[in-house]
Amino acid sequence: MEKKQFVISVYTENHVGLLNRIAIIFSRRKINIENLNTFPSGSEGIHRFIICIRETEEAVQKLVKQIEKQVEVLQASYSI
């Protein structure tokens, strides 16, 4: 499968250490984060992460499922 550019969007509760746990999910799979932005969403106490990577769609699907397993993660999705 061909690697493509993907954008992963993650909505989370604002908790200390969550960014580190999400980054570990990427590093265990040897996936490089090309771009990462985090900012408050429109709801109080909720933050949004925008993560850009270059990977196969199959790997991204598995990655998003793993991110969603984190307790503080409310929603994770990806797009091309």
Specify the residue positions occupied by each region the protein language model found.
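A conserved regulatory-domain signal marking ACT and ACT-like small-molecule sensing domains
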Residues: M1-I80
